[in-house]
Amino acid sequence: MSSAALEVRLNHRFPGTEIDVCFAGRGCTVLFGPSGAGKSTIAMAVAGLMRPDHLHLRVGGLDLHDLPPERRRIGVVFQDARLFPHLSVLGNLEYGARRAPPGDFPLSGDFPLSREEIMTMLGIGALLKRRPATLSGGERQRVAIGRALLSRPHMLVMDEPLASLDQARKQDILPVLRRLKAAGLPMLYVTHALQEMAYLADDVVLLETGRVRASGSLGHISSDPALSGGFGHEAGAVLEAVVSGHMPDRGLTILSCAGTEVLVPLQALKPGTGLRVRIPAADVIVATESPGHISLHNILPVVMTDWQPAHLQGKAGTTQEALVRLALPGGHLLARVTRDAIQRLGLEPGRHVLALIKSVAVDVLGP
């Protein structure tokens, strides 16, 4: 199966509240929003773990909503892994394999996914004889992903799969999830962690009290000041980039990004490697003329397009901060400034300015 489109229309009433959503996505579709927004309910309905009042579910041209859960071929990974404690790792994996229908694994391309390949990719081959109670949190999640994959799913539904892991364990698993996405396995991914969204998402669905506030590509959602204000202090644009070269004598790597060059601390990546970068709005300085001697490496010509008030959690009343959208040749940045700065600098749509960014402020999300 190719990286197929996902279509969801869902309505369900709970006592005192209602979830009513309609969205479509490509590749990895991330459901993002605060607690109580309806993310997990949507994931459970798609996976067939609850029966909503109304559901339309289409994955890769296949209508799945009329099928019972066991025939939808949807692999599910939860926050707490939910492995069978009385079975070994091998027993848990074999449980997933027994649920797989006959036929080819649905992934496309030259990405082999036999049982052995899955275990190698997830790094769980040495764990087969162990019981879940003896595994670390990261090991349990890798086994849970392997069990889901061995069921030969049409897609994966992942509900906060990394929420209980420390940062090091997250960094072990995120590249595996990106490889699965690149291999063509559609995902519905629930999270409230911006880094996970930035690393994995193709499309993002912003949820708020059971409704879709906005949906679209990661690049659009992350660089729209009207939407990114909801990310609070973590607002920032996510951009696709390619390693174009290195300057080891200066400790820098050159990235081709959004039609311009961005310098970051030296990366151990080959030229031509594709990756993503996240540039926090709080780390972007807006200038109307080029500064003199300065430690900043990145001085990028941009065009101011629009701005919105920055709604920050924990700040009451009218905020005096704003998110300004800045156009690059092939994308957009966000900058957090004060309203006073907008007036002082005469920032208005169409104004040519400079975006100043420290190289160490660019969050390189990896290949």
Curated annotation (Swiss-Prot):
Signal peptide extent: none
Q: Name one GO molecular function term.
A: ABC-type molybdate transporter activity
User: Topology versus the membrane, per the UniProt entry?
Assistant: Peripheral membrane protein
Q: Which residues bind ATP?
A: G33, P34, S35, G36, A37, G38, K39, S40
Keywords assigned by UniProt? ATP-binding, Cell inner membrane, Cell membrane, Membrane, Molybdenum, Nucleotide-binding, Translocase, Transport
Q: Which family does it belong to?
A: Belongs to the ABC transporter superfamily. Molybdate importer (TC 3.A.1.8) family.
Q: What does this protein do?
A: Part of the ABC transporter complex ModABC involved in molybdenum import. Responsible for energy coupling to the transport system.
Name it. Molybdenum import ATP-binding protein ModC
